[in-house]
């Protein structure tokens, strides 16, 4: 078979399969009639969302508001934090406020607590006693000490998932007259602006590393080819500090595989576990925005349609059931990363999936595989979720939502809930019902910049009011460290020539607090210490005025 000429122009690996393809009754999302949410659907989704929200709210660490990696119904300490779970949790708090599960004030207080904890932890290249380095966070944290747990890696993808939650709360809590919401926006901005995006880039191939350890350096793995790292590249290209160039997107997409599967006749960009098709869409609306790597799949083809096809392919595999599991079928399906019945001789936690070069299937189904795809294909997801809840009852479902996974062939039901599996269920259900998360994220310049610089055009990107910001010229390299700080911080700046300088400190309301300098200084680097111990915590600004211009620097004082 001759490969189309347009394919040769794209850095894609197009796999033409010789499988016998099963005919499918399938419609692209723009062809299918809009799904009408019935009263019964609304009742079911209300309960599912509320119960899943309860897990994030009730199981968060009490002293920090940060979310654990996993828990059981009866877990109480919940101090082992997953920063990816925190990203879903921050977003969940906004959904809870919008749905009335908690008040907006309660949600804002919880978010403020969590952001302050993330800022309070120490950032350095030390191996112990630190929360992260260069603005990136360790995969797992001990909430009691706000430091690295289990010798985990400084994780690129998990930091990105957390940052999406930070972006969400920066834009959701938008009341300019509310001091608490203003503090949330300020804290979120500091967290976002200090991520050194270029730090994780492999200088040899433009790819983003899977992570870094102080003991051994960068992990020997870069994200390349379609998976959940789409969100990581969009943030890194659109970020504030040392963003990656557009060429990084070209490197990432050069590993794409486009193919059909044995049981699904429609080609799509494959990644076997469904979570890779879900995480980016939980926050970003990819409907109607296009990129050149998608042209070969059709004029209207977008990443939303790609995720819909992946969902249908996953279900089609389970219906075909080549391994003859006793329960697979039209309403019992869903393969992605999840726990498993390891004690029964099966796999434990593993990235299961049903498309791409490797099928991983040991009979273990997880509700998040279907639930995280509800926005793409509610017509097949809602019947599956209802069926699993009704059939297995309290063995699989509780007032914290669905437990992580089950394997009917050995009568195994997980006792754990996992944050990164709970999150897609809650966020995607909200996007189906109100598009709250998507619409909130569209307000942020990091998201808009990242998409536009990666080459996305069309749809809502053409009408957004968010314009790419021009970075200010840092005439004096005004800065301070540490930032955030506890009582004392050192303010630094540089002068190109001898000149008059005034350096003042202002609080968040614009009132001058003190004058640190009002004199003539020689050219060169300068620094001075500022003691804020007698002032209330919060946001402060240093303002440097000279004969050559003005520059300001935001500083965050925490205790």
Question: What are these model-predicted stretches?
Answer:
Residues 19-23:
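Sec/Tat signal peptide C-region and signal peptidase I cleavage site
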Residues 10-18:
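Bacterial N-terminal signal peptides
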Residues 462-468:
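Short, compositionally biased serine/threonine- and acidic-rich segments at solvent-exposed termini, linkers
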Residues 1-10:
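Bacterial N-terminal signal peptides that target proteins for export
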Residues 24-462:
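Ser/Thr/Asn(+Pro)-rich, low-complexity disordered segments
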Residues 2-3, 213, 245, 531:
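Short, solvent-exposed coil/turn linker segments
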Residues 4, 469-559:
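C-terminal outer-membrane/trafficking sorting elements
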């Amino acid at each position: 078979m001759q490969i189309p000429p347009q394919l040769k122009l794209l850095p894609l690996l197009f796999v033409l399969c010789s499988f016998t393809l099963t005919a499918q009754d399938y419609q692209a999302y723009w062809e299918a009639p809009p799904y009408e949410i019935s009263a019964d659907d609304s009742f079911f989704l209300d309960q599912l969302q509320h119960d899943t929200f309860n897990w994030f709210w009730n199981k968060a660490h009490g002293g920090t508001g940060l979310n654990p990696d996993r828990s059981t119904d009866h877990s109480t300490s919940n101090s082992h934090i997953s920063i990816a779970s925190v990203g879903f949790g921050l977003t969940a708090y906004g959904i809870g406020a919008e749905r009335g599960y908690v008040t907006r004030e309660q949600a804002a207080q919880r978010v403020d607590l969590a952001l302050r904890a993330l800022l309070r932890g120490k950032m350095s290249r030390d191996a112990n006693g630190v929360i992260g380095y260069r603005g990136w966070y360790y995969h797992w944290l001990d909430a009691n000490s706000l430091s690295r747990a289990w010798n985990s890696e400084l994780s690129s993808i998990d930091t990105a998932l957390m940052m999406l939650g930070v972006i969400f709360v920066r834009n959701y809590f938008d009341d300019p007259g509310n001091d608490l919401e203003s503090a949330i926006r300020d804290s979120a901005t500091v967290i976002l602006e200090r991520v050194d995006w270029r730090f994780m880039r492999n200088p040899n191939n433009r790819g983003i590393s899977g992570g870094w350890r102080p003991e051994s350096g960068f992990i020997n793995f870069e994200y390349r080819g379609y998976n959940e790292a789409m969100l990581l590249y969009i943030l890194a290209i659109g970020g504030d500090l040392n963003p990656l160039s557009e060429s990084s997107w070209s490197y990432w997409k050069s590993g794409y595989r486009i193919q059909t599967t044995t049981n699904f006749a429609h080609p799509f960009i494959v990644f076997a576990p469904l979570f890779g098709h879900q995480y980016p869409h939980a926050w970003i609306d990819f409907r109607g925005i296009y990129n050149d790597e998608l042209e070969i799949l059709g004029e209207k083809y977008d990443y939303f349609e790609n995720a819909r096809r992946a969902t249908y392919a996953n279900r089609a595999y389970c219906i075909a059931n080549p391994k003859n599991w006793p329960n697979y079928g039209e309403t019992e399906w869903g393969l992605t990363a999840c726990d498993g019945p390891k004690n029964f001789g099966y796999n434990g936690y593993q990235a299961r999936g049903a498309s791409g070069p490797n099928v991983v299937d040991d009979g273990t189904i997880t509700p998040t595989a279907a639930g995280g795809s509800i926005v793409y294909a509610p017509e097949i997801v809602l019947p599956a979720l209802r069926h699993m809840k009704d059939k297995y009852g309290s063995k699989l479902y509780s007032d914290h939502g669905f437990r992580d996974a089950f394997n009917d062939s050995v009568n195994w039901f997980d006792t754990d809930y996992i944050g990164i599996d709970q999150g897609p269920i809650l966020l995607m259900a909200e996007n189906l019902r109100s598009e709250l998360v998507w619409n909130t994220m569209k307000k942020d310049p990091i998201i808009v910049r990242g998409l536009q610089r990666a080459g996305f055009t069309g749809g809502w990107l053409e009408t957004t009011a968010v314009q790419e910001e021009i970075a200010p010229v840092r005439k004096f390299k005004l800065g301070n460290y540490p930032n955030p700080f506890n009582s004392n911080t050192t303010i630094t700046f540089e002068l190109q020539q001898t000149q008059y300088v005034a350096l003042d400190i202002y609080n968040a309301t614009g009132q001058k607090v003190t004058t640190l300098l009002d004199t003539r200084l020689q050219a060169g680097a300068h620094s001075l210490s500022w003691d804020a111990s007698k002032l209330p915590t919060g946001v402060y600004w240093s303002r440097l005025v000279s004969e050559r211009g003005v520059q300001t620097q935001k500083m965050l004082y925490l205790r």
